[in-house]
């Protein structure tokens, strides 16, 4: 199936590793062009090299920077001549339980994970035309809190609510808004979380036993799902929060 992504241009944040990078790879594989972001210039340059300099451009920015959104959209237009959508993927806040997290951690995560995403979505909404799309990489914690991820549990559901409101507001202009809710995907982040336990391998096995497909997902599987949702092939899909979790969410 042709997803209709050829020569379309997307900004993908947090794309130097993990789910953001997997999504950028899937978009490029389908013929799209991407502007990828990350905080470190060397990591951004490495990601651009891996994706191909003819199909990818990079920008070292911090999502918490109020001016980042406008710069990224301008970079897409300057490098590739158009702007068709954005995928907001931000690394997870530090793990911790309620009693362990500080005001400073909450504030930093709010600026980067929440407010940075809101700013980029607002800027994209002002620039996109009919057929544009705004995507958010969120978490299964949108539906059910994950033990030990208190800050993420507090912020991700709020972003899902923001995305739903945005979908209602932008729908009449033909602009879609979608969310992806990853479960246990085999990324550095998930392996780091597993490693916090006394027995990481036992922790992984226990987690896999609760997943109907009995395994962690791969970044490539997530990336292909993201590419489809961002593509014209999903032109009648908006306002959804799609679990990519191997069936871990048992509710409807």
Labelled PLM ranges:
Residues 51-66:
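Rossmann-fold cofactor-recognition segment
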Residues 177, 181-196:
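Short, flexible catalytic-loop segment of classical short-chain dehydrogenase/reductase
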